[in-house]
């Protein structure tokens, strides 16, 4: 794990910009029409992508696909000399990918760059939207999730990286769908890579049932065959 222990404890995972506060009901959830993982040219460590896609396809009703994306970032998007401002990145990503998919496409940009928010030293992932919005997007930084250098092609620890990203993306999908349950099981809020690695990769029973009823999760995990 890179970074000091102090920074690790200060890290926040998957900060949702819009969170519903009303009591949960199946009718309030929206299922994605598809889940798209966008891969910029700068992301050269990609061995984790295939197992990530396979894992998501096993549990999600919606199809999951990857998409190459030409995207660049200007200096005014920097939060520090070595970190991008996650809000500026997400806003830019939303504009670049706006013509791809539909309002119910859940779109995720996988970046090798470190991200920062205004109040946190760094973030692993952030998502924007909920069941009421016409956008559902997320940004995931593999800078600290990749066990090697994400800007260099390598095979080291691909399954570890895939599982870390899987937990973040699956939690985000549930939140963007409108799930407002407490932070528990996969929805828990780790503050370090160790906590992320140790936390469950599954939903608690009540949340799992709500997501199945809403058509977000499959009733039984299985390969989709696509």
Where are these regions (language model features)?
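Bacterial N-terminal signal peptides that target proteins for export
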Residues: 1-9
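Bacterial N-terminal signal peptides
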Residues: 10-17
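Boundary at the C-terminal end of the N-terminal hydrophobic targeting segment
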Residues: 21-25
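Eukaryotic intrinsically disordered, low-complexity regulatory regions enriched in Ser/Thr and Pro
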Residues: 29-30, 49
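Fold-level signature of zinc-dependent metallopeptidase catalytic domains
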Residues: 31-45
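Metzincin-family zinc-dependent endopeptidase catalytic domain
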Residues: 46-168, 179
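Metalloprotease/metallohydrolase-associated module, dominated by Zn2+-dependent proteases
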Residues: 135-164, 180-226
